[in-house]
């Protein structure tokens, strides 16, 4: 994987929950209050659209709305990592490009996953992350999430970091 950035991030980057109203619709004013609270409480950065943020229950339009609304509101006060996970390489790369264009400092991506019984081998995992990396100029945080069902060996992670 190519080196994308010399920026060094450190400190606390909590996952921002997605705020919904009583009808299950996005509550953007509530979302921005939550973001402000996390920044005012001393967060060094934020991570949006992660598993805890209910990313899998959001439509693409809702993801885009949250990404642009939050990044515009944060306006560089802290770095924001945007989760762009998708099992399809093309979709993940496009989500990552859009996150970069909106101002994300980094994207967080789970390995490709295809349900409970279909596993992607290490060559496929490497190709997936290489394609996403080639699509953007910001770093990728690889999320080793057990929910994906795709294990990432220490050796694979170390080799991709080089």
What is each of the regions a protein language model found here?
Residues 2-152, 157:
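Active-site beta->alpha loop and helix N-cap motifs at the rims of alpha/beta catalytic domains
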């Amino acid at each position: 994987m190519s080196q994308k950035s010399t920026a060094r991030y450190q400190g606390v980057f909590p996952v921002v929950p997605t705020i919904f109203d009583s009808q299950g619709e996005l509550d953007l004013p509530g979302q921005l209050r939550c973001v402000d609270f996390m920044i005012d409480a001393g967060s060094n950065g934020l991570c949006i659209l992660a598993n805890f943020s209910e990313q899998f229950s959001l439509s693409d339009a809702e993801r885009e709305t949250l990404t642009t609304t939050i990044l515009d509101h944060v306006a560089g006060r802290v770095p924001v990592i945007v989760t762009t996970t998708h099992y399809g390489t093309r979709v993940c790369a496009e989500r990552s490009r859009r996150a970069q264009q909106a101002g994300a400092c980094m994207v967080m991506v789970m390995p490709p996953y295809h349900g409970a019984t279909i596993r992607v081998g290490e060559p496929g995992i490497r190709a997936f992350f290489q394609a996403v990396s080639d699509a953007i100029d910001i770093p990728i945080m690889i999320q080793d999430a057990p929910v994906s069902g795709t294990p990432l060996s220490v050796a694979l992670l170390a080799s991709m970091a080089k």
